[in-house]
Amino acid sequence: MRRVLVVRLDSDGDVLLAGPAVRAVAAGADEVVMVVGPRGQQAAGLLPGVDAVEVWRCPWVDGEPPPVTREGTEEIVDTLAALGADEAVVLTSFHQSPLPTALVLRMAGVGRITAAPGCSTT
């Protein structure tokens, strides 16, 4: 079974805009798990193709971030590792880097990671 994580850690609107990407991923996956921030959780549950939702209050994306700690990092690495994903697609806006998230995913044992940073129209 091919399980793919789609990561979009922003708000509901940003998660909804990820809908076409989620559907494209779902077309080639057996299961899609959407990894979102708390402000995007409601929208993730509405998207076609999403089988499960995992909420992560990511310290470098959240508007009121928790501190970055060893324990917090180990906790999300363990949570993501337990999902047993074969692949992850990291979606960000133009002002965010996908690299910290990709590092956490690699630490969780995700073998293939694709990042698609957003682009600015200005």
Short names for language-model regions:
Residues 1-122:
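Catalytic machinery of carbohydrate-active enzymes
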